[in-house]
Each structure stands twice: as C-alpha cells, then as structure tokens.
C-alpha cells in the first residue's frame, strides 16, 4: 500500500507567521511537499509564485472567494441572485489556480441568507447550486482543473451553511453529472453531521477529489484527544488506495511545528522517515 500524501493548510497552520509566502517556506522546512489555502486573494500573486518556486511546493487547493465576508458571506455558489458574482469569483480563482499550477478549486456553496429559513429556500438554493456548478464544470474542464464541493457541518461550525452533509453533496453531484466536479471530504465535518465514517468513506471515496482532517470535537491535531481514531482512518484510506492529498486543516494546540509529531510518526511508520 502506498503511503498517504499530506499537505499543509496555510490558512490554519503556521499562522505564527503573518504572510502566506512565509507560511509556505515554513511548511517546506517542516517537511511538507504541498500546501493548500482558503483565500489568497489579498496576497500578491508574484510573491506566491516566488515562494512556490523557491520551495518547490505543490499547490493543491484554493477556495473561490467568499463574497462579502463583512456581510456574512461564505461562498456564493448556492445563493440565489448572486450568480454573476459567483462567476466573477470563479474567474479570479481560475486565474490564481493557473498561475500557481493548482489543479483543485473548492467551489464554496454559501449560507442560507440571513432572515430566511433553510426549508423555505432549500429547493431554490439547490437549483442555483446545480446551475452554477454546471457552469463551473464547463469553465474548469477547459482549463484542466477540478472543482470540489465540501459539506460543512451545520450542527456546530456553521448552522446556516447550505451544503452540510455528504449525502446531500452526493445527490447534487448526481444532478451535475460532470467529471470536473467532485466532493471534498472533510472528515471533521462528516463525523459531526453523520458519523458512520467507515461506511461513508467507502461509499463516497470514488466521487471524492480531496480530503481534509482534524480531530473532533475541538478541531486540533489528529493525535489530540477526541472521537476519531486516525490510525484506523489512515489505514482504511490506504486500503482503499486513495491517491489524492489529505489537507491538514486544524487548529494547532500550540505551535504548528510542535504539533506535527503525529505526521512525523506516520512518515516514520510508512517511509522510514521519508516524507511523501
């Protein structure tokens, strides 16, 4: 079985450093060969490219812009009436992805509009989401990029986020029916919403294009106290021959570097200490 590949989410890790290029260099020094990030759009693209060239890091994933974050936006793909803004954000994400040789873009669904009930808008939001994803599929297919949709739990993290379970995401992917759109499996969110991880991982891995991890419930390192046995989960993913990256999207309990012993232990157990 091939060892799993991990990437550092530099929106969550190495935040001891203020700038993304600095975090990229720190990630490379810590042994990572790849990184991902949420929103890089306030960082000069030339600086990101320079850091990438200096470190040799692979950029694995970025998100589409959130919209107006100050007004509570967290993505626009499923928000009725915001289709043009979504397309503009997608174009910007594609520009950054192409410049950074990043092949995956998380197409953020967004939140149920404030003052509205989820049940009242569910069908309209799903139709909007499917419509926007079909548009995105055409754009991404031409560019050789992969779009991802990620369920974010609505029990704890974000009660208003529209896409909140893997089952809902799978139904939407069936409606979109395009190989350029897949699922982003965040095991933290999946455990909170549904549990039953072994079954759900087996069931949905074939339609998954990226994985992210954090311990439940506090979203710290995988080896911190919590509900999940990551040794078992990693072995399961190896047995299922998962070939993609696993994003480390968690809140370090202390310094990022001190919290990476779980990863070094994994590298030692699989590669004799060599990172993959």
UniProtKB/Swiss-Prot annotation:
EC class of this enzyme?
isomerase
Q: Name one Pfam family in it.
A: AP_endonuc_2
Positions annotated as active site in the UniProt record: 150, 249
A single GO BP:
glyoxylate metabolic process
On whether Signal is a keyword of this UniProt record, the answer is no
Q: Which reaction does it catalyse?
A: 3-hydroxypyruvate = 2-hydroxy-3-oxopropanoate
Leader sequence segment: none
Listed A to Z, the keywords are: Isomerase
Source domain of life is: Eukaryota
Report a single Gene Ontology molecular function.
Answer: hydroxypyruvate isomerase activity
Family, similarity comment = Belongs to the hyi family.
**Protein name per UniProt:** Putative hydroxypyruvate isomerase
State the organism named in the record.
Answer: Danio rerio
What gene does this protein come from? hyi
